[in-house]
Amino acid sequence: AYSLVGRAQSSHMEIPMEQDPRNSLYLLYADFLKRYNPKMFVFENVMGIKSANGGATWRNIQSYFKRIGYVIDCKEQNSSDFGVLQTRKRMIIVGWRKGSECLGYPIFDKVIPDTTVNELLQDLPMLTPGKSKSNYGRTRRSAYVIDNGIRTDKDVLTLHQCRPNTRRDIKIYKRAIQLWNDGHQRLNYNDLPEALKTHKNRKSFTDRFKVVEGDQQCCHTILAHLSKDGHYFIHPDIRQHRSITVREAARIQSFPDSYFFEGPRTAQFVQVGNAVPPMMAKEIARGIAQKLKEEAQIKNDQLTSGAICPVQKNGT
């Protein structure tokens, strides 16, 4: 509801963004807080949450959480800072009970990826459009895949099935891949031969075909739009000339291969695209746990020394 992309497209929406019922979903989250009264909580949202409706939405959220007994802080985090091979900027909101001054927004340990997207995907079997594989075969795992527990020793592979593509799409994919691999250039739809152009609204379709940045440490953001088509997520290997599979998208999000997404392929792509990357979530959880441990230690020290818990000033 607060997406910057969605805001740019709001003139084409049936329901104006300011009337989107999702704007009040935080009230449902607050119901759980009132019921369980945790010391701390965390939730993730898109970058536009603080600027939506001229900032009014964020002020309403702050005010409401304050009324139910919580202080909240919101900071931009990028999944690539957590070892995930993807640029994914999100607002991570952390809240803690009012009066618990020992608590506050955690400091997260940042890990810059030291591998490439190609190395992340290299042990997944090659596919051509419409094909699938249910085992790895003789493929070599990268150190990143091993160290982060993405793949086990079992030779069972799920969700590695790619969409079928038309001959026209395959020709376009090959051009897009060649441009990227030769000089990191993006395909401009208007530069295609007329025989390959089928969309009337060519202005909005200019950057519709995009190759995953295989030779980089981070690729562009995996989106739920993958459920509609794969043109924006073309596999970087020109021999395969296809869009990425659910398993490949899940790997880019840092999901282990043992994680299975239910439902038809469209629903699986939506789940992957909307998810918080597990490696990022793990570090956020560690940071929250560390804050709670620090508070417990300070309170324990108070019992023996009579000291007062220092007030931690945090922006709200």
Each language-model region and where it sits:
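Short, acidic Gly/Pro/Ser/Thr-rich loop/turn segments
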Residues: 1, 100-101, 129, 215, ...
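Class I S-adenosyl-L-methionine
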Residues: 2-199
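C-terminal target-recognition/interaction regions appended to catalytic cores
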Residues: 147-316
